[in-house]
Amino acid sequence: MANKSVTVGQLEIANDRPFTLFGGMNVLESRDMAMRVCEKYVAVTNKLNVPYIFKASFDKANRSSIHSYRGPGMEEGLKIFQELKQTFGVNIITDVHEIYQCQPVAEVVDIIQLPAFLARQTDLVEAMARTGAVINVKKPQFLSPGQMGNIVEKIVECGNQQIILCDRGTNFGYDNLVVDMLSFNIMKKVSDGCPVIFDVTHALQCRDPFGSASGGRRDQVTELARAGLATGLAGLFLEAHPDPNTAKCDGPSALPLDKLEAFVAQMKAIDNLVKSFAELDTACRD
């Protein structure tokens, strides 16, 4: 199976290329916080020579509670993204939830993301595809990896071949997620070699069944990220925060920002090792 590549700015993203770090924060909390987090990621990835794309949401439209913080909104969020690009020269990924958001967001950021909960909404998928932007498709928690081929087909039928697929865990009963390490290879196959990345942060979510916000297992982020990258991926999706306990969204799953350099160094070492191996064809044939 040949690996397809997606070009974002000067970066080439593919399953057989050095992994790209899609990193930042869950939601834009403020302009100053975004600058602080982005600055740290840029410093670490420049030092370690790791390709980097900044990620954050301007609106978390699928929060559990109506009282939860959602973000600054599209207009203010795009202004912050523009400042980050001008200041740090970063490429940016963010998600959209409504059809009207697709074109204006695609004019500012480099990758638009299809949220997991919305990945089968055909009208939204088509609107995103027709922008011509690179699209990152989050695998829904309720969907098998093999079904991702149908979403890819919708995008391709709209004339867009710039597709990245992302796993963020699968429902394991109520209010819990697990990651099937075989799913990455299945997603590569059903997409004919599209880049596949792993959202380790959201895979760590674990809810209180009666609570109004997601819990998490940040103490297991290193082990889970190591395991994912050991399968040979195009990228890792990671959220970090200076003080995860006070983060406005998904703090329990976020990496403490001061641990970022040590974490990324480990991930790079694993990625380098795995991609130094020759690929073995172990399929049984008559």
Swiss-Prot record:
GO terms for molecular function: 3-deoxy-8-phosphooctulonate synthase activity. It is found in: Cytoplasm. GO terms for biological process: keto-3-deoxy-D-manno-octulosonic acid biosynthetic process. Its EC number is 2.5.1.55. GO terms for cellular component: cytoplasm. Pathway: Carbohydrate biosynthesis; 3-deoxy-D-manno-octulosonate biosynthesis; 3-deoxy-D-manno-octulosonate from D-ribulose 5-phosphate: step 2/3; Bacterial outer membrane biogenesis; lipopolysaccharide biosynthesis. It catalyses: D-arabinose 5-phosphate + phosphoenolpyruvate + H2O = 3-deoxy-alpha-D-manno-2-octulosonate-8-phosphate + phosphate. SUPFAM superfamilies: Aldolase. It holds the Pfam family DAHP_synth_1. Keywords: Cytoplasm, Lipopolysaccharide biosynthesis, Transferase. Belongs to the KdsA family. This is 2-dehydro-3-deoxyphosphooctonate aldolase. It comes from Haemophilus ducreyi (strain 35000HP / ATCC 700724).
